[in-house]
């Protein structure tokens, strides 16, 4: 299909910035702990935990660290009392923004989030104001070197919902959250190494941003992702690879 993977360019930028800030392990451990607390400590019966562990392993987290986080979540070890919160809002040019947070202090978190929105041209919305624009999906991405033919049969047989192939050579395999682990296992078994694999919030529609709007929006995105309590930031902005490259220079 025409264009490029709609979440690849900003995802790669975000991953690099998370690593630079040294925050990626903190967020991964928090997600593993809460996933185990909510759905149990067995990744075979807890798809969310399975996805969190896979992501941690892909970021070279040690298995001992993962096991400790699972035990804290499942109650085998003492852990922090962390709440999950979702906030919704709009960025510049009407971009919808959905935040997943984990916090031990709700008042601090909402104050920090509201400040970031108001400072950088956005506004914090009410519950339900943008969540309906997103659907939770598993996304397994492949870059150059993996063909649509290679992923088609094993992905669909394992329960994938869709396969999107883009002009520049990348491929996204779309799954339900429940089938994410099974589909990834099937593709891994074929020796197909994903460039990125996660359960995420996929927007129904996108808002195209020009360079100036993108510059403003990315400042807001950086500010939100830099907040300690913010776990994930989802949005429906579409920014071209060329604009991303110019703004990163």
Curated annotation (Swiss-Prot):
It is found in: Cytoplasm. GO terms for molecular function: DNA binding. InterPro entries: Integrase-like_N, TACO1_YebC-like_2nd/3rd_dom, TACO1_YebC_N, Transcrip_reg_TACO1-like, Transcrip_reg_TACO1-like_dom3, YebC-like. GO terms for biological process: regulation of DNA-templated transcription. Keywords: Cytoplasm, DNA-binding, Transcription, Transcription regulation. Disulfide bonds: none annotated. It comes from the Bacteria. GO terms for cellular component: cytosol. HAMAP family: Transcrip_reg_TACO1. Belongs to the TACO1 family. This is Probable transcriptional regulatory protein IL1088.
